[in-house]
């Protein structure tokens, strides 16, 4: 949707994925591929909004596995 999102809390996850592509979404957060592996986004802050759990952001903004961040 053309809005920026800041990743406020994240942690590395085992595995590999395509950089910038959501690998999975679950109750704990959103797993995204990077050039060096996977990251679990735990807390994010959408542009102009308060910080929120990444899982809530995914539900509210239609982020699903296969979504390419930067094209949401």
Predicted regions and their residues:
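An anion-binding loop in the catalytic cleft
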Residues: 1-72
């Amino acid at each position: 949707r053309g809005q920026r999102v800041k990743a406020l809390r994240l942690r590395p996850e085992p595995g590999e994925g395509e950089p910038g592509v959501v690998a999975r979404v679950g109750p704990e957060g959103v797993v995204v591929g990077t050039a060096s592996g996977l990251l679990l986004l735990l807390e994010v802050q959408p542009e102009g909004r308060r910080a929120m759990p990444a899982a809530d952001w995914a539900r509210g903004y239609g982020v699903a596995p296969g979504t390419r961040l930067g094209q949401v």
